[in-house]
């Protein structure tokens, strides 16, 4: 049985594609077709528990099933020195060599990682977890850690961390930009992250994507469970724009987007969840995918505002996408291999490039991972 790639990520030059399927990571050279694979996570064995404290309880020992730890995120560090993977059951950050896929270091965190970012020199890594804590460590110190990280977090939110970025001001001073499930975007100094510099308020739903403008580092884009993409002057906490996507994706929404009310009754309203927001490096173009749709929306930055340049229909629902230069790759539902597209002046067309890789083998359903999970961040009222 085959598990599709649930993450695809291109190198900045577009010559290499990294991908994750369940607990496997692949490195595909797009020029030669060579594929290297590594299993980042073995099965995580859960401990057994007894159902009582009497001698006979030994006969009633409850054996919990072995769990499978999946790769939850996969990305190159900003400087390109490391391939970073995070896992769920083992709560780990794994540093891989981008060329060989050799595991350089595996560090276990107290709670499950939910977001990770690096500085531009690859000297520091910040990682947020599902309980809202953010850890900031130098790579040098991480390489010395044995077992679980014991350091204290550098900052904390009251809800799950959903996205992280490291930004810089005009004097090249670093800041942690952190977002959570409670619609908050916080700007904190780094490494003195107890000093909160600013908040960016405006989201009504969770924030799952943060992106600093490659052409102007003072501008931040954010998206998540709202209909809109937000544009910020992040250091001043000023909202510059919010661009609605609804009219552009309405025809692509389906039963997966239907809102079910507190009584469990399906309504006519369909909810939008942005699963990914990426910029084509050194260009004014951004690409957006709304989860569980077969649409890629191309946005253009004009005077620090966004406008829709085009909407492209893919062959099937997009699981994950990545862009580098004029190359766009997508992992799509039911596809035998990764799809390749060409982007020219904001217009997407089908490419002649063939990428036969798009999945890995799995043995049982415990290895399957949810392909469309971003929408689960949306909070529901009590019945």
Swiss-Prot record:
Keywords: Nucleus, Repeat, tRNA processing, WD repeat. Belongs to the WD repeat TRM82 family. It is found in: Nucleus. Pathway: tRNA modification; N(7)-methylguanine-tRNA biosynthesis. GO terms for biological process: tRNA (guanine-N7)-methylation; tRNA modification. InterPro entries: Quinoprotein_ADH-like_sf, Trm82, WD40/YVTN_repeat-like_dom_sf, WD40_rpt. One of its GO terms (cellular component) is tRNA methyltransferase complex. HAMAP family: TRM82. WD repeats lie at residues 66-105, 156-200, 202-244. This is tRNA (guanine-N(7)-)-methyltransferase non-catalytic subunit TRM82. Required for the formation of N(7)-methylguanine at position 46 (m7G46) in tRNA. In the complex, it is required to stabilize and induce conformational changes of the catalytic subunit. The gene is TRM82. Forms a heterodimer with the catalytic subunit TRM8.
